[in-house]
Each structure stands twice: as structure tokens, then as C-alpha cells.
Amino acid sequence: VREDEAPTTSGAGGIDHRSQTSGGSVDRLRAYLHEGVAVRGRTTDDVTGAMREAILDGVLSPSAWLRESELASAFKVSRTPIREALKRLADEGLVVKTAHHGAMVAALSLEDVLALYVVREDLEGLAARLAAVRRPDGLVEQLDEINADMREAAAREDVAELSKLNLAWHRALRTGAANPYLERFLNQVEHAVRRLPATTLVHPGRPDEVLAEHDAVARAVQARDGEVAEQHARAHMRRAREIRLAVLLGG
């Protein structure tokens, strides 16, 4: 979560992520890896996973150029796993590859954000409905426990911890839906949300709203009321979209 990076809107209606040279981002990547981000080995899978997290955590900034030689040096590997990792991340939409200029971290436009939240509302609503109908053992207790931890983080004004717990709450809900395809699609949505340059939880009053919205979903899940759970989850996402746009546009 990078609440200190406030975007501006471009003339084309997008988010103006400042153009980045590769050097600064790669220096941050070296520090990130040195601080203990897990690269369990030097395989393509290991490198891909670590690079993905670096993008999602904002260490590799939107629009930053990704030079194979610099990345290979940072990861202490040859260019081969770097090249394959960039290809995989391009397939996931996290990296953009060009014919003559190499690869760069993908940036999201304002139009992308709007499209993202349309899909997110549908998918989160479906996850809530399925979770309520199936209500696996321990799910309601897990949702309530995470929400209680969020309340404590909000009281401390710990936005970073609050954001992590918010992700955990939504992961628990979609896991409770017990649909592997839905979980996969929502994982991709989460990746896109994590790439945005600010969190809605910095907006005044939003943490308390989120806690109440989560509780409404959890109570519907507890009652096994799929229709009401979906309604609350959709309302939660619509409000999230409103706040997201306010944060991005400086409102």
C-alpha cells in the first residue's frame, strides 16, 4: 500500500503514473530482496513470484522499464529465468512488452479502474452468495475475527495493517465460496487492485464504513441468506468504487 503516492489524472482521462527509468526501481528491488522477500530458489517460478510481489507492492513502479540485465543482477540469475518471468507476467497483465524497447511495468488508466470495479462488483457478489449458501465450518468466525483485527488496526490508524487485513477478509470470503474458477478470477482482480497507487482506506471515515459493510455481509452469510449476502457485497463494492475514484481524482 502506497498511500504517499498520489496520482494525477492525465489529459486522456487516465492515471498519470510518472515515467520511470529502470535504475531507481531496480535499486528499490535490490533493497526489497535484501530485506527478506522470499526468493526460495533461482528457478523461473521463484523469480516470477518475487517479481510479481515487487510489482504488487509498488517496489517496481508503474511505467518503470524492466531491463533484463539489471533484473538478472538483482536476482543473481542468468537472463533466461528473467526473460521467462517477464513473459509470464506479461500474460498476467502486470508487464507490457514492446518489440523494440523491452518490457515495462503496466499502468492502469482511469478507464481500466472503472472496468475493474464493474467486474469486481459481480465477482464479489457471487462469492458472497456462494459463501452464504455453503457456509463452510469456521467461515463466519474467521470473517468476524479478521474484522475485529481490522477494528483494532483502524483504532491505531495503521493503514498498512488495515489494508492487509482487508485483503485477508476478502480472501476468506472467496475461499468460503469454494469455487476454484471464481477464486482464480478474484485473485486476478486483487492483483489489479493492489497495483493502484493509493488505498481507499485513507479516505476520511472509510475504515468505519468498511467494518460495517463487512459485518453486514458476514451476518447474511451466518444466516445462509445468499441473496442478501450478495446485495451487501455488491453495495460494498459500489461504495469502494466511489471512494477509489475520489482518492484517485483527489476528491
PLM segments and residue spans:
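Mobile beta-alpha loop/short-helix "lid" or hinge segments that flank ligand
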Residues: 90-96, 189-191, 205-208
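Short coil/turn segments
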Residues: 135-136, 206
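Hydrophobic alpha-helical segments typical of transmembrane helices
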Residues: 51, 81, 112, 169, ...
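Short amphipathic alpha-helical interaction/hinge segments
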Residues: 193-197, 201-204, 241-248
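Residue-level signal for the nucleotide or nucleotide-sugar donor/cofactor binding architecture
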Residues: 77, 205, 224
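Short linear motifs at protein or domain termini
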Residues: 1-133, 241-251
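Bacterial carbohydrate/catabolite-sensing allosteric modules
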Residues: 11-12, 157, 224
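Conserved amphipathic alpha-helical segments that form helical-bundle/coiled-coil interaction surfaces
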Residues: 116, 137-198, 212-220, 228-239
